[in-house]
């Protein structure tokens, strides 16, 4: 009897030792991943901030420096990070720990934190894709927006969003309360700014909207942007020392013009005069993620026009977005550059989902495409403004996309052969897209609780 008790006690100690070892292993895996990510981000941030770049960008050379030489490698690295995240989440679940991780690499990095409001700037460590080095105002002070008005676009009142975004120094901009901001003229941002609307219900609506022009390092997170109108032909301040005459603003929700290191994340965008997100005039190093797009015609334009060859260096990641109700086309519409479209949910379109001209490279991975009932609109892709069969040389790839309701993707170029050497590693399975994109759009965040 004593021998049996001794054996039972010994077995319990062995099991306890194994359990503790597993806990420490899983914790170390997660901590090592986070430490590595933060170290790389910090080193990149220090390097970037010590560069001789001015607040506003000028010329092709500076923007070229922000484009990577091997975009397929970046897509490969993104997939590796997704795989690492999945391994760590699986390890925690096997040990019986609760995990809020759902395979969305960006959200899994920060959304589980109940103290997100005390660690707001950790968001800047969580970017992925071509815009992963968009640090925004991480190295600056907080600026609290207390006033929803926009009465004076030349001499904006302190406490307003316009006053915040034109400042020269890095700023992390947050909001004291819920507010609806009706901008009289386009909101012209300055470099190294984060607009972080978590914890408040903030709408930019029924007026002008956001312009990111010839600047670098901007994060826009958590806004509702809708019903943007065409404005302009007035003087608008763009910095404390400069105000200038502005021509017509088209009425885009977010216009990114000649800028780099930009991250547009977790916004709800709809029903604007022109585009919802336009990326043009040599912009590069952009990530557009976790957004919810609805009720709009021309959703996303990536590339100025066919003759604007500076856009050949454009590199954009479009990830984890939900392209939803009432959309017609351009999700996105691409020119010249390299575009990684990964794990998005396409539940509605009336004409086509992904289109392009001027020989863009489009790498589509793990997306879910649900075609409309209209039999003439089942094709996901659309080549525009092409001569003869020249489009057959364009590299448009589809890898493990989920095509439902008769949807079909027409590959071309290297994509037509399915050559795995030219493709990055698989993204999350398209069957997981519903979970990954379930929280796309502006989140509901309360202090002391994870954001949902």
UniProtKB/Swiss-Prot annotation:
Positions of Ca(2+) binding: 250, 274, 278
Glycan attachment positions: 88, 139, 214, 233, 271, 281, 305, 374
Keyword field: Calcium, Glycoprotein, Lyase, Metal-binding, Signal
Keyword field contains Calcium: yes
Signal peptide annotation: 1-25
Catalytic residues identified in the record: 330
GO molecular function: metal ion binding; pectate lyase activity
GO biological process, any: pectin catabolic process
Entry's EC annotation: 4.2.2.2
Catalytic reaction list: Eliminative cleavage of (1->4)-alpha-D-galacturonan to give oligosaccharides with 4-deoxy-alpha-D-galact-4-enuronosyl groups at their non-reducing ends
Cofactor: Ca(2+)
Family (UniProt): Belongs to the polysaccharide lyase 1 family.
Note on how the cofactor is bound: Binds 1 Ca(2+) ion. Required for its activity.
Pathway it works in: Glycan metabolism; pectin degradation; 2-dehydro-3-deoxy-D-gluconate from pectin: step 2/5
Protein name (database record): Probable pectate lyase 9
